[in-house]
A protein has these predicted regions:
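RNA pseudouridine synthases
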Residues: 2-200
Length: 200
């Protein structure tokens, strides 16, 4: 486990966590059956930067620095969030173009983004529990790069173009990557990774 004593007392603590499926992005129970961040041995003074819903997986950042939420997640900062979404059926070029132009969700258009079919298709760690496959319906992994992150936005976007999301993994926030960090594990960020946050 990462030794938090490596952080000088004056330095912000910044951690990367591979949030598994079925974990809520908070330390206190929410009344559901889901596990919380308290189950993973984090230092006592950190809190999540942004959120991933319980059904989503991947990179979740935690810190003891209060202003990092705005520094990392406000659209004006331009820190792109990259998601890999496993969707029903293989999207055609027009569906991907629709995602890039923006789709209407709840009466408003999403901001332009980048969307593409992953080639080759990634081999991801198994999800527990596994997703439900429809026997005669193919699936595919696509990537989306967004600078905004409304509630369930990626799932709503892919559903709006006819490709419901089966599994969603956030793989990158700005220059910070999930990499090969295993589900349920966390680590402190390197000096170079921290610089990519604090110098922007």
């Amino acid at each position: 486990m990462f030794d938090v004593r490596c952080f000088p007392k004056s330095a912000a603590m910044l951690l990367a966590f591979h949030k598994p499926f079925g974990v809520v992005s908070q330390f206190t129970p929410d009344g559901s059956r889901h596990r919380t961040l308290a189950d993973f041995g984090f230092p006592t003074r950190v809190y999540p930067i942004g959120r991933l819903d319980a059904e989503s997986e991947g990179l979740l950042l935690l810190s003891d620095e209060a202003d990092l939420n705005a520094r990392l997640l406000h659209p004006a900062r331009g820190h792109v969030r990259t998601y890999w979404a496993q969707v029903e059926r293989v999207p055609a070029a027009e569906a991907l173009a629709q995602l890039e132009r923006g789709v209407k969700i709840g009466g408003r258009m999403t901001l332009p983004c980048s969307a593409w079919l992953l080639d080759p298709q990634p081999v991801m760690p198994p999800r527990v529990p596994p997703i439900r496959f429809r026997k005669n319906v193919p699936d595919a992994w696509i990537a989306l790069e967004l600078v905004e992150g409304k509630n369930h936005q990626v799932r709503k976007m892919t559903a709006a173009v006819g490709h419901p999301t089966l599994r969603l993994v956030r793989v990158k926030v700005g220059a910070l990557e999930l990499g090969d960090l295993a589900p349920g594990k966390w680590r402190g960020l390197s000096a170079a990774e921290r610089a990519s946050v604090f110098t922007r």
